[in-house]
Amino acid sequence: MTFDAFTKVVAQADARGEFLSDAQLDALSRLVAEGNKRIDTVNRITGNASSIVANAARALFAEQPSLIAPGGNAYTNRRMAACLRDMEIILRYVTYAVFTGDASILDDRCLNGLRETYLALGVPGASVAEGVRKMKDAAVAIVSDRNGITQGDCSAIISELGSYFDKAAAAVA
């Protein structure tokens, strides 16, 4: 079962039979203060998801044209659609992780066993990882645009966002 940050803190305090500590409350207060930034981040990525995936795939196939050549892993419309679907699923779970501030949903529901599945299907993990890195670059650029977003230092959330993409790329490579 996946727990959010609040549930984890309460479960830890309850297991010890203690009230929440000042340090725990301060940490949760900071998380709440960052909540609007998380929502803005997820909204921006979600609103641009189609272009993030399409542009990452386009750039990947431009760099690795053998993927879309006859016999390539993304050759035929069915395989191309599966590739785009998988990229979109990874992006979606990255947004869930950013929203909750917890990578476990990404690990448990998306990445767990993905490398093995790709190996069994003959999908080149290095190419998938490169596609994920291209989505990371696009998502970070979109989130880093300071126009129309909650003001303040967003470097921590941007770093966190990047770490989820890095985790996904490493999981499939």
Curated annotation (Swiss-Prot):
| Residues annotated as binding (2R,3E)-phycocyanobilin 1 | 83
Question: Which residues are (2R,3E)-phycocyanobilin 2-binding?
Answer: 154
Alphabetical GO CC annotations of the entry are: phycobilisome; plasma membrane-derived thylakoid membrane
Q: Where in the cell is it found?
A: Cellular thylakoid membrane
Gene Ontology biological-process annotations: photosynthesis
Entry's InterPro entries?
Globin-like_sf, Phycobilisome_asu/bsu, Phycobilisome_asu/bsu_sf, Phycocyanin_b
Q: Name one Pfam family in it.
A: Phycobilisome
Q: Which residues form a coiled coil?
A: none
Where is the PTM N4-methylasparagine found along the chain? 73
Which keywords annotate this record?
Antenna complex, Bile pigment, Chromophore, Electron transport, Membrane, Methylation, Photosynthesis, Phycobilisome, Thylakoid, Transport
Membrane topology is: Peripheral membrane protein
Question: Highest taxon of the source?
Answer: Bacteria
Q: How is it modified after translation?
A: Contains two covalently linked bilin chromophores.
> Among its keywords, does the record have DNA repair?
no
Q: Which NCBIfam families match?
A: phycocy_beta (TIGR01339)
- Stated role: Light-harvesting photosynthetic bile pigment-protein from the phycobiliprotein complex (phycobilisome, PBS). Phycocyanin is the major phycobiliprotein in the PBS rod.
The family this protein is said to belong to:
Belongs to the phycobiliprotein family.
Cite the record's note on assembly.
Heterodimer of an alpha and a beta subunit, which further assembles into trimers and the trimers into hexamers.
Name of this chain's protein: C-phycocyanin beta subunit
